[in-house]
């Protein structure tokens, strides 16, 4: 699959979707994107910057949601203009899609909306690549139906069906907890869509702090290594210059100063894994 200006798939090095959870300010966004660009260029990692203009799904109605759609999109547009980076952001309603698609390179659907047929259809008809997040409540094999919905809508609109990714971000395990089943990454390959692993939301503790979500960022490297060892097309990781002061999802964000070391390890592992065919393909 061609994504932005690079190829993605199990026969290609993993690509990275990374950035702050939410757009907090223009300067921090540009600085963070610039630093990530430097790191990824050094390691030859294809890179898409991500950040949200609005956090529609918050634990508390008093939580910071963002700078607003117009300002958030303007800042993401500056990332493209100043740094020459492709940009991804999530959309939350059908009404937002046209305006968002006019600015960003890749759309993302929130996990909680993966079963909303009209919403998935509308995203698919945008003409943009779409990273479709698997709901925390969904079995991995059920993602085939979700991807098929997107492909059907794209085909009916006369658009390419080869623009959709399936993203794993953990599954609910009791209250305020998520677990990652690495088998899901292999199962989701059966969609014939590139599989992306969200290593930071997978360590989230949803609502675990009462009015906000907690997280266990110390396990991000553990799960990221496991996903790369399993074999994925891409990784999704949120980061922040100072996670303790992040306005959203700080507890599961990778400290920006640690991203280089983490990615260096993951690149080495990815190269080793993709040097040979995946053994599970011959086990049935």
From Swiss-Prot:
Signal peptide: none annotated. It is found in: Cytoplasm. It comes from the Bacteria. One of its GO terms (molecular function) is 3-deoxy-8-phosphooctulonate synthase activity. Pathway: Carbohydrate biosynthesis; 3-deoxy-D-manno-octulosonate biosynthesis; 3-deoxy-D-manno-octulosonate from D-ribulose 5-phosphate: step 2/3; Bacterial outer membrane biogenesis; lipopolysaccharide biosynthesis. Its EC number is 2.5.1.55. It is an enzyme of class 2 (transferase). It catalyses: D-arabinose 5-phosphate + phosphoenolpyruvate + H2O = 3-deoxy-alpha-D-manno-2-octulosonate-8-phosphate + phosphate. Keywords: Cytoplasm, Lipopolysaccharide biosynthesis, Transferase. SUPFAM superfamilies: Aldolase. GO terms for cellular component: cytoplasm. One of its GO terms (biological process) is keto-3-deoxy-D-manno-octulosonic acid biosynthetic process. Belongs to the KdsA family. HAMAP family: KDO8P_synth (MF_00056). This is 2-dehydro-3-deoxyphosphooctonate aldolase.
């Amino acid at each position: 699959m061609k994504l932005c200006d690079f190829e993605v798939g199990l026969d290609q090095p993993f690509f990275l979707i990374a950035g702050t959870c939410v757009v907090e300010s223009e300067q921090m966004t540009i600085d963070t994107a610039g630093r990530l660009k430097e790191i990824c260029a050094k390691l030859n990692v294809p890179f898409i910057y991500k950040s949200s203009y609005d956090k529609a799904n918050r634990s508390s109605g008093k939580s910071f949601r963002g700078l607003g759609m117009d300002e958030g999109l303007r800042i993401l547009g500056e990332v493209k203009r100043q740094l020459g980076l492709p940009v991804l952001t999530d959309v939350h309603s059908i009404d937002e899609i046209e305006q968002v698609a006019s600015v960003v390179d890749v759309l993302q659907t929130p996990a909680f909306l993966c079963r909303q047929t009209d919403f998935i259809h509308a995203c698919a008809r945008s003409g943009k690549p779409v990273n479709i997040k698997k709901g925390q409540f969904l079995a991995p094999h059920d993602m085939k139906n979700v991807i098929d919905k997107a492909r059907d809508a794209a085909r009916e609109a006369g658009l390419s069906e080869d623009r959709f990714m399936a993203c794993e971000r953990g599954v609910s395990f009791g209250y305020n907890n998520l677990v990652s089943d690495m088998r899901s990454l292999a199962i989701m390959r059966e969609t014939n869509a590139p599989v992306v692993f969200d290593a930071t939301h997978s360590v989230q503790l949803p609502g675990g702090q009462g009015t906000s979500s907690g997280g266990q960022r110390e396990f991000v490297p553990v799960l990221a290594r496991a996903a790369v060892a399993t074999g994925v097309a891409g990784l999704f990781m949120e980061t922040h210059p100072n996670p303790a002061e992040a306005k959203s999802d700080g507890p599961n964000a990778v400290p920006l100063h640690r991203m280089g070391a983490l990615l260096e390890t993951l690149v080495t592992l990815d190269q080793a894994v993709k040097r040979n065919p995946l053994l599970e393909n011959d086990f049935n």
